[in-house]
């Protein structure tokens, strides 16, 4: 994806002295292009670190995003600096051999980035269409094979000119020009852009249709399933509970509905984020892949060098703006970016070993002053959950529950308003260990052993995970 230098159109067989450098223009271009390159390098490194440092982002979908960031990082760190120098000087200063290698690496990285977006679009289609079956369809092994195919195909498309599939090179080594051999131009344009673009658009059209249909069905199911007084859908399944056959069927149906709603909501969010990425990709790369074939097949209609350079750098811009898109459209990435920038990776890894803590509080009348900040979830005659806060991905809930009688391990007072706080880090299906105890410890033999009640909870609010 290398453009003609200023004198490349002259088929000269002699080496011209390099033109003088305009100092003011060189400084201006150096600041602009240098800032763009630095932003692209740091931004893509930030994407990679955000996924690497957060275990909840270790999924096949996020590995695809890391692959995209790796391709963009290679482009911004190994190709763009030489492109910027070429632009500033106005001639190629690194020799013929390096020109050919540089052009091949350019095509390799750009094609890998575009094909990576293609794989992501297929992944989102599967995630939205089959949210419950997605983990069995998209496994880590299959994801790795898909990424290997991306890089293998990109390599095949990029190495053609290195083996002679190009027009004769000019003898002037200060000229590094795009490969305008019509056969290769058609092959690379189809393989690098138009075929992936077609797949991407088809997949996202399917995603839009499925998401619209599923949203309508799931939202109507949510409205009929919850009572008028509840603002949050809550499913609690006590382990070893004795219920009738109809109750088991009803509980399973409600659980299946809640899990499907939760998973679909997450996949829909990811599809929206990556839809923005794809939209920016089309806007950035389409001008270049329109200009390049026109210049190759219709020389009389060749665009001006200025138009070509704008289209050329617009394509490069795509590799620098993806790190902006993620935090702006995804709360998940925004928090991950903030943690990395605050150097909280190590701290989060250490704290992830203790995903649940509890503290004892006074009875519920103490919380009456905070009532306006609470979300009450009535779940039974003896139990009530209160949502206290939700910060940095951690949901804090308070449960008020009467303790069971006759417990062999019971060494605490049976206070019907005993309260504990559960800090839950997961945003999806939650298993919460609620430790219940009194506000004042007893002096029994085993007073340090809390009474444990295990609940499996799935939480969602208006179809969104908590």
From Swiss-Prot:
Location within or outside the cell: Nucleus membrane; Cell membrane; Cytoplasm; Membrane, Caveola
GO BP annotation list: adenylate cyclase-activating adrenergic receptor signaling pathway; cell-cell signaling; phospholipase C-activating G protein-coupled receptor signaling pathway; positive regulation of cytosolic calcium ion concentration; positive regulation of MAPK cascade; regulation of cardiac muscle contraction; regulation of vasoconstriction
Taxonomy, superkingdom: Eukaryota
Extracellular side: 1-27, 89-99, 168-181, 298-305
InterPro entries hit by this protein: ADR_fam, ADRA1A_rcpt, GPCR_Rhodpsn, GPCR_Rhodpsn_7TM
Gene Ontology cellular-component terms listed: caveola; cytoplasm; nuclear membrane; nucleus; plasma membrane
Transmembrane segments: 28-51, 65-88, 100-122, 144-167, 182-205, 274-297, 306-329
Glycosylated sites: 7, 13, 22
Motif residue range(s): Nuclear localization signal: 334-349
Major location category of this protein: nucleus
Pfam families in the record: 7tm_1
Cytoplasmic side: 52-64, 123-143, 206-273, 330-466
Keywords, comma-separated and alphabetical: Cell membrane, Cytoplasm, Disulfide bond, G-protein coupled receptor, Glycoprotein, Lipoprotein, Membrane, Nucleus, Palmitate, Phosphoprotein, Receptor, Transducer, Transmembrane, Transmembrane helix
Subunit structure: Homo- and heterooligomer. Heterooligomerizes with ADRA1B homooligomers in cardiac myocytes. Interacts with CAVIN4.
Function statement: This alpha-adrenergic receptor mediates its action by association with G proteins that activate a phosphatidylinositol-calcium second messenger system. Its effect is mediated by G(q) and G(11) proteins. Nuclear ADRA1A-ADRA1B heterooligomers regulate phenylephrine (PE)-stimulated ERK signaling in cardiac myocytes.
Protein name as it appears in the record: Alpha-1A adrenergic receptor
Gene: ADRA1A
């Amino acid at each position: 994806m290398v453009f003609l230098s200023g004198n490349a159109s002259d088929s000269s067989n002699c080496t011209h002295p390099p033109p003088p450098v305009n100092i003011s223009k060189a400084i201006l271009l150096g600041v602009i292009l240098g800032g763009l390159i630095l932003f692209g390098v740091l931004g893509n490194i930030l994407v990679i670190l955000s996924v690497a440092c957060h275990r909840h982002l270790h999924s096949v979908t996020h590995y695809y995003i890391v692959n995209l960031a790796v391709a963009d990082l290679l482009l911004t760190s190994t190709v763009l600096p030489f492109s910027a120098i070429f632009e500033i000087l106005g001639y190629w200063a690194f020799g013929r051999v390096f020109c050919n290698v540089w052009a091949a690496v350019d095509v390799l990285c750009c094609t890998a980035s575009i094909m990576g977006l293609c794989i992501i679009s297929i992944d989102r289609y599967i995630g939205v269409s089959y949210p419950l079956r997605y983990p069995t369809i998209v496994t880590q092994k299959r994801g790795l094979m898909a990424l290997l195919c991306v890089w293998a195909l990109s390599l095949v498309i990029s190495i053609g000119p290195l083996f002679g599939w190009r027009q004769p090179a000019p003898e002037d080594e200060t000229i590094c020009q795009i490969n305008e051999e019509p056969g290769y131009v058609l092959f690379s344009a189809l393989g690098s852009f138009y075929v992936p673009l077609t797949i991407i658009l088809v997949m996202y059209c399917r995603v839009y249709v499925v998401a619209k249909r599923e949203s309508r069905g799931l939202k109507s199911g949510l409205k009929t399933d919850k009572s008028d007084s509840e603002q949050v859908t809550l499913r609690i399944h006590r382990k070893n509970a004795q219920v009738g056959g109809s109750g088991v069927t009803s509980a399973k149906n409600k659980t299946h509905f809640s899990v499907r709603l939760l998973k679909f909501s997450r996949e829909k969010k990811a599809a929206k984020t990556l839809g923005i990425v794809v939209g920016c990709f089309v806007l950035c790369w389409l001008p270049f892949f329109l200009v390049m074939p026109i210049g190759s097949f219709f020389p009389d209609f060749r665009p001006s060098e200025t138009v070509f350079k704008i289209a050329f750098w617009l394509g490069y811009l795509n590799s620098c703006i993806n790190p902006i898109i993620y935090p702006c459209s995804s709360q998940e990435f925004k928090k991950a970016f903030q943690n990395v920038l605050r150097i909280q990776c190590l701290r989060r890894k250490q704290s992830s070993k203790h995903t649940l803590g509890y503290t004892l509080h006074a009875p519920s009348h103490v919380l009456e002053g905070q009532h306006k900040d609470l979300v009450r979830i009535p779940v039974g005659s003896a139990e009530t959950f209160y949502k206290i806060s939700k910060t940095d991905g951690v949901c804090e809930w308070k449960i008020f529950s009467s303790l069971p009688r006759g417990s062999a391990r019971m060494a605490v007072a049976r206070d019907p308003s005993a309260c504990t706080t559960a800090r839950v880090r997961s945003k999806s299906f939650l298993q919460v260990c609620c430790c219940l105890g009194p506000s004042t410890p007893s002096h029994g033999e085993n007073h340090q052993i809390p009474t444990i009640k295990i609940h499996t909870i799935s939480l969602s609010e208006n179809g969104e995970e908590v």
